[in-house]
A protein has these predicted regions:
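Short, small/polar residue-rich loop motifs at catalytic or cofactor-binding pockets
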Residues: 117-119
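Glyoxalase I/VOC metalloenzyme domain signal
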Residues: 4-55, 60-113, 123-138
């Protein structure tokens, strides 16, 4: 069943599925993808998350086996507008933001320059154009 929150963001209430048995109240974060295989490789590299074996959709999950899946879903049509929601990733202590930026580009992503002035994080898009932010290490 597809519902919407007060800001009209769609979300699904799914039937019980064995693959989501231990994910908690949020089973999965779907991400539209022009190429789920390519984006799966990108997000696995960026997050360090592992492939979910036996999943019907290219899915990744934290190596601890806890929390929701990141599901790379085939997009219905090419992306034309900014996503209503986006993911944030945090750099590890000692990672150089410029080196991470170069590596993101080498893996098919690109840095965005939204013109918001000086901020502590940097904005990017994955190979399918999904926006995300890279936050500084704590």
């Amino acid at each position: 069943m597809v519902l919407a929150d007060p800001e009209d963001n769609a979300f699904c209430v799914l039937e019980e599925r064995s693959e989501y048995a231990d994910t908690g109240p949020i089973a999965a974060l779907p991400l539209a993808s022009a190429d789920p295989g390519r984006n799966g490789e990108f997000w696995a590299w960026l997050t360090g998350w592992d492939d979910v074996p036996g999943s019907t959709t290219r899915s990744l999950r934290h190596p601890s086996g806890r929390g929701p899946f990141l599901e790379l879903c085939p997009e219905a049509e090419p992306k034309t507008v900014k996503n209503r929601l986006h993911l944030d990733v945090r750099l590890e202590t000692g990672e150089d933001p410029d080196e991470v930026s170069a590596a993101i580009a080498a893996h098919g992503g690109r840095e965005l320059h939204p013109g918001w002035g000086e901020l502590p994080w940097r904005s990017y898009a994955d190979p399918s154009g999904n926006e995300f932010c890279a936050l500084p290490a704590r």
